[in-house]
Amino acid sequence: MATPGPRDIPLLPGSPRRLSPQAGSRGGQGPKHGQQCLKMPGPRAPGLQGGSNRDPGQPCGGESTRSSSVINNYLDANEPVSLEARLSRMHFHDSQRKVDYVLAYHYRKRGVHLAQGFPGHSLAIVSNGETGKEPHAGGPGDIELGPLDALEEERKEQREEFEHNLMEAGLELEKDLENKSQGSIFVRIHAPWQVLAREAEFLKIKVPTKKEMYEIKAGGSIAKKFSAALQKLSSHLQPRVPEHSNNKMKNLSYPFSREKMYLYNIQEKDTFFDNATRSRIVHEILKRTACSRANNTMGINSLIANNIYEAAYPLHDGEYDSPEDDMNDRKLLYQEWARYGVFYKFQPIDLIRKYFGEKIGLYFAWLGLYTSFLIPSSVIGVIVFLYGCATIEEDIPSREMCDQQNAFTMCPLCDKSCDYWNLSSACGTAQASHLFDNPATVFFSIFMALWATMFLENWKRLQMRLGYFWDLTGIEEEEERAQEHSRPEYETKVREKMLKESNQSAVQKLETNTTECGDEDDEDKLTWKDRFPGYLMNFASILFMIALTFSIVFGVIVYRITTAAALSLNKATRSNVRVTVTATAVIINLVVILILDEIYGAVAKWLTKIEVPKTEQTFEERLILKAFLLKFVNAYSPIFYVAFFKGRFVGRPGSYVYVFDGYRMEECAPGGCLMELCIQLSIIMLGKQLIQNNIFEIGVPKLKKLFRKLKDETEAGETDSAHSKHPEQWDLDYSLEPYTGLTPEYMEMIIQFGFVTLFVASFPLAPVFALLNNVIEVRLDAKKFVTELRRPDAVRTKDIGIWFDILSGIGKFSVISNAFVIAITSDFIPRLVYQYSYSHNGTLHGFVNHTLSFFNVSQLKEGTQPENSQFDQEVQFCRFKDYREPPWAPNPYEFSKQYWFILSARLAFVIIFQNLVMFLSVLVDWMIPDIPTDISDQIKKEKSLLVDFFLKEEHEKLKLMDEPALRSPGGGDRSRSRAASSAPSGQSQLGSMMSSGSQHTNV
C-alpha cells in the first residue's frame, strides 16, 4: 500500500507505522478499510446549512480528497508566521478564521524516537479547501511512532470520531501535531457564518435590527431631573467603557431568522455575532454532538467526564496586561473593573454581561446592589453604636453595678477555688454590654428586617430592568432546552440499568422461552426505586454531619468548662479566666468552622452525585441546598448556643448542674451573654472573611497556578524554543484555573447575609464589616474572573435561581431570631417590666438589686465552699442573678412571680415583634412593584416599534419586488399576483411578530 500523502493522513492509526516526510503522493492509493480521514465541508451556497456533502461510502484517500479539506499533519517549520496571527493569537494559522472554542487533551506515546532534522513545531490544520503544503524535508531522519496502549488508543479513536462529527455539523477545526512523547494538544474550533446563522435561528438568539437605538426615558419629570442630577454628581464614579455610557439607549432586537436577513443590521458577518455569542453557539453544538465509540455518549461534558478530553473552553479576548495599544474587552474590564485602584467606581455591568454572559452578569449586579444597600445599614449601625457610647455614663444599671457603695456580695463562680466577690468588680463588663444592649438596638432590628425586604424587592426590580435591557424576556424556551441535556453520570447510570435489564430479560427468555414486553419508558430513565439508595445515603449522611457539628460544639463547651475550672485553681490566672476561655474557645470555633466548611462542600457534592440528578440545573439546585444546610449549621451553631442556651441550664447555688462528675455548667457574665455573643459574632465573621478571602481565594489559586506552570515548564523541554517564547492564547488560557461555577461565590455572600441579619440586635456593626469586606470582594472576584480563570461559557438566565429563595428565607428567619435575641438574651424586657411595673418612680433605679436573688451560704453543698476565703467580712447571704424566692420565703429558691411575669412579657414581645415586622415587610413588598413602571411602559413601546418597523421593512421588500415587474410587459398582473402571493407570508410573519410581542407583555 502506498503511504498516504501529507494531505491524507488517516486519523485512526492501526499498527505501528513509519512515516517519511517525503513518502506518498496525492495520486497514491487511499488508506485501507477501517481508516478514516477527518474532512471539512467544502464551500457551500449561502442558503445551505452546514454539514458535509461527502458520500459515506467515498474513500478518504486518493483523488477524492482534492476538493475536500482534511487535516494537514505536516507544516513547514521554517515558514514564517504572519505578524497579524502572532499579534492576535486568536485565529487559525491562516490568520483569517477566528478561534471560537478550544478542546484540550493530554496524550502520551510509547517508544517515540525523534530523528534529527524533524521540525519541532508543526500544526495539523483543517483548512477550508486550501492546497496543502509539502512536508518539511530538513533532514534524512524518519519518525518512528510506537503503539499507544489500549486505553490511549481507544481515547484517540473516540476523539477522532467526535471531531469528525463536529465537522459534519459544519464546524472547522485546527489541531496540533503530536510530535512529542507526551504533552497537551489543542483542537481549535471555528464556526463559519452558515453555522452561526443556522444555530442562531435554532436557539432564537435576539440580535439588533436596522432600527436605530432609542432612548429609555425616566418615568416622570421629577424622576428625570433626579436621575440627571445623580448622573452628573456621580460622573467621576462611572467606568469609562462604551457600554456603560450608553446605558439609557437600547437596540430594537428580534430573534434571528435566515429568511428575514433584511431586518438585521449586518454590516460585517465576521463581527455580527460577538465572541460570547459565537462561543455559546459552538458550545451548544458540542453539547449535542454524539460519539458512538464512547457508548453513544452525548456531548463534550460526557467526554470530559470520561477523560477523553481534558478541558473545553472559549478564548479570552487577548491579554489583559499587554503593552500594546490595541484594546480589547478583557483589557478594558481589567483597567476599569478588576483592579483594587478602581474600587470606588461603579461596575460596568453591561460589559461584564457582554464578556461573561448573563449568569455572571447577574451575579455581579446582585453583589453590587447588596454592597450598595449595606451603606445605609452601616450608617445606622454606627449611629446605634455611637448612641451606646454616648449614653454609657447615663445608663442607671451600669452606674449601680460600678458603684462600690452598693455592697452586692456575689456567690462564688466555681467550687472550692473561687471566693465571694463584689459586683462592682464587673463594672467594665457592664459598661461594654451597654454598647450593644440598649434601646436603640430594638429599633435597629426592626430597621434591618425592613432593610432585608427592601433589598429583595429592589433586586427584583433591578433584575427585571436588566432582563429588559439584555433581552431576557421569553427565555423560558431556552431553559426548557437546557433541561433536555442529561448529565454524563445520569446517562451512564441509565446505560448500566438498561444493560442489566437486558441481561436479566435474556436469561428469563432462555428459562421460560417466552417473550415479555416491558415498559420502555421506565427503561430509559431512573425511577425512584433506582434513586432510593442514594436518597437514603443522603438522609443518613446529612443527619450524621449535623450531629457531628453539634458534637463539636458540645466539645468546645466542655473545653470551656474544664479550662475555666483549671485556670481557677491558679491564683495568677484566676482574674482573667472569663476573657481567656472566651477568646480561645471562639478561635477554636473559627478554625473548626473553616475546616468543616471545606469538608462539607466536598461531602455535599459527593452526596449530590450519588443522587444522580438528570440535568445540570437540578444538580446545581440540590448541591446548593445541601451545601447551604450543612454550612448554615456549621457557621451558626456556636452562635445559637451563646445566644439562646448558654446560662439557661446552670441551676442555682446549692443545686448547680454538673457535667462529667464535678464540672459546673458555664454561666453568663454579670452583664449578660450579649457581650459574649457580640465577641463570638465579630471574631467568626471577620476571621471567616479575612482567612477565606486571603488564603482560600487568593493563596490557593496562586499555588495551583504555580504548580501548573512548573508542570508545563517541565513538559515544555521537548517543545521548540520559539514556541515556548511566544505562547498562543489557547496556551495561556489553558494554564489558568478552570471555571467551576458561581456556587462558592454566592455561598460566601449568603452566609455573610445571615451574619448581617440574623443577629444584628447583638452586633450592630456587622453591616460595617460586611461593607468593608464586599468592597474588596467585588474587585477580588472581578480580578479572579478576568485574570485567573478560563473564560466561562456564556449562559443566559433570567434570575439568580434558588439563591433568591434562600435569601428570602433568611430574611424571614432573621425576624424570629432577632425577636428572641432581644427578648431572651438581652435585658431589654426585664428593664421594661421593672420600669413600668415595679419601679417606685418610673426609672431604672434599683434594677440591679431587683435582678439578684439571695442565697444562704450555709446551704452550700459539702466540699463546694470557698477554701481560705479572704473576703473582708463574714458572709451570711450571697447574691446570684435570677428571679427566685429568698431563703426566708415559704418556698425558698423557687421561681418568683417576677420570673413568670417577665417570661410572659418576653413571649408576648416575640409575638408582637414578629407580627409587626412581618406586617411592615408585607406592606413594603406591596408598595414596591416588582416591575418598574418605566420598564413596563417601554415593553409596550418596544412592541409597537417592532411591529411598525416590521411592516415598514415588509413594505420596502414588496416595493423592491414590484419594481422590475412594472418595467416588463404585463408587469401589472404579475406584480399583483406576486404581491398577493407575498401577502400571506407577510401576514404570517406579522402574526409571529405579534406573538413575540405578547411574550414581552406577559413579563
UniProtKB/Swiss-Prot annotation:
Q: Which InterPro entries match?
A: Anoct_dimer, Anoctamin, Anoctamin_TM
Family the UniProt entry places it in:
Belongs to the anoctamin family.
Name one cellular component (GO) term: chloride channel complex
Q: In which tissues is it expressed?
A: Retina, especially in the photoreceptor synaptic terminals.
Protein name as catalogued: Anoctamin-2
Place the motif DLG4 binding (PDZ) on the sequence.
Answer: 1001-1003
Activity control summary? Channel activity is repressed by chloride inhibitors; strongly by niflumic acid (NFA), partially by flufenamic acid (FFA), and only slightly by meclofenamic acid (MFA), 5-Nitro-2-(3-phenylpropylamino)benzoic acid (NPPB), 4-acetamido-4'-isothiocyanato-stilben-2,2'-disulfonate (SITS), and 4,4'-diisothiocyanatostilbene-2,2'-disulfonic acid (DIDS).
The answer on whether this UniProt entry bears the keyword Membrane reads: yes
Q: How does it sit in the membrane?
A: Multi-pass membrane protein
Q: Which reaction does it catalyse?
A: chloride(in) = chloride(out)
Decide whether keyword Transmembrane helix is in the record. yes
Spell out the residue ranges making up region: Disordered.
1-68, 961-1003
Q: What else is known?
A: The term 'anoctamin' was coined because these channels are anion selective and have eight (OCT) transmembrane segments. There is some dissatisfaction in the field with the Ano nomenclature because it is not certain that all the members of this family are anion channels or have the 8-transmembrane topology.
The cellular location(s) given in this protein's UniProt record come to:
Cell membrane
Segments on the Extracellular side according to the record's topology features: 387-434, 560-582, 645-748, 823-907
Chief localization: membrane
In which residue ranges is the amino acid composition biased (Low complexity)? 10-21, 978-1003
Could you state one GO biological process linked to this protein? monoatomic ion transmembrane transport
Which GO molecular function annotation, any one, does this entry have?
chloride channel activity
Which residues are sugar-modified? N422, N841, N849, N856
- Gene of origin? ANO2
Q: What does this protein do?
A: Calcium-activated chloride channel (CaCC) which may play a role in olfactory signal transduction. Odorant molecules bind to odor-sensing receptors (OSRs), leading to an increase in calcium entry that activates CaCC current which amplifies the depolarization of the OSR cells, ANO2 seems to be the underlying chloride channel involved in this process. May mediate light perception amplification in retina.
What ranges are annotated Cytoplasmic (topological domains)? 1-365, 456-538, 604-623, 770-801, 929-1003
Alphabetical UniProt keywords: Calcium, Cell membrane, Chloride, Chloride channel, Glycoprotein, Ion channel, Ion transport, Membrane, Transmembrane, Transmembrane helix, Transport
Outline the subunit composition. Answer: Homodimer. Component of a presynaptic protein complex recruited to specialized plasma membrane domains of photoreceptors. Interacts with DLG4 by its C-terminal region.
The residues that cross the membrane are 366-386, 435-455, 539-559, 583-603, 624-644, 749-769, 802-822, 908-928
